[in-house]
Amino acid sequence: MTRRREKAVQPVGTRRAAREFVFRVLFEADRGDLPLDTVFTRAEGAMREGDDTFPQLSADALTFANELVRGLEKHRADIDTTLRRTIRGWSFDQMAQTDLNVLRLATFELIYTAEPHPPVIESAVRIARKFGGDDSGRFVNGVLAGLSRSLQSAGVAKADEQADTAQD
């Protein structure tokens, strides 16, 4: 077996599997204009019945996937606003649905979770490459790297403001 092939059959990490599961749920919900929680419940049932459309998840991965879905539901409007500000020269209508949903999922994690940015971005790029077009991985990487930098700059600015306020 070649190195590339060995790498391809290695098990997917819990968080990455959960992200891929949620990506599929998000894609299906958007495509069918259905509530995210309804599609998640249906996907969870299909997974438990052995439907290979949705990857099998461990209990920990399913818990993480559920947290992602709840967060996406709660913060969807803010996530879309952030993406509209971040992506220059593209409207949501011009973007592939695959790319947009990968970006939504990763943007939620970058803004609303304590996950380190590099693994979130790496997972998003892998999902984009797996399900998107030829340039999806590069596009997603560029958008998320820019967003990560701006969030880190804003975090530094906020930390500086809090330190100045505390000294007063």
UniProtKB/Swiss-Prot annotation:
Keywords: RNA-binding, Transcription, Transcription antitermination, Transcription regulation. HAMAP family: NusB (MF_00073). Belongs to the NusB family. GO terms for biological process: DNA-templated transcription termination; transcription antitermination. InterPro entries: NusB-like_sf, NusB_fam, NusB_RsmB_TIM44. Involved in transcription antitermination. Required for transcription of ribosomal RNA (rRNA) genes. Binds specifically to the boxA antiterminator sequence of the ribosomal RNA (rrn) operons. GO terms for molecular function: RNA binding. GO terms for cellular component: cytosol. CDD domains: Terminator_NusB (cd00619). Disulfide bonds: none annotated. The gene is nusB. This is Transcription antitermination protein NusB. The keyword RNA-binding applies. It comes from Deinococcus deserti (strain DSM 17065 / CIP 109153 / LMG 22923 / VCD115).
